[in-house]
Amino acid sequence: MSTAPKSQPVSADPVHVDSKHYTIDAENDRVRVIRARYGPREKSVMHGHPSLVAVFLSSNNGRFTFPDGRTEERSWKAGESMIMPAEEHLPENLSDNPLEVVLIELK
């Protein structure tokens, strides 16, 4: 059985294309909880997420590169949460500290 949410192809699933940074904490037929961990200055590969809630466990700055080449820098503090729309991106930790975030993907 695939662990990818039904709303995206397995090839874009971060757990499949970047298992170094993404692991599944829990999953059922309605949600999937992923933990993302990046070392200082590490980046991922292009992948996608369905709509989700992000809960940040560390304070960091990051850069997101989108399929069209556009980039966006974002900052967050430990303990913050935010609702994020479905998107494809390549994230990068711009901080000198590790980044950890829990992603609650909606199916």
Residue ranges with predicted function:
Residues 57, 106-107:
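Short, flexible beta-strand-to-coil junctions
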Residues 60-63, 88, 98:
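Structural motif
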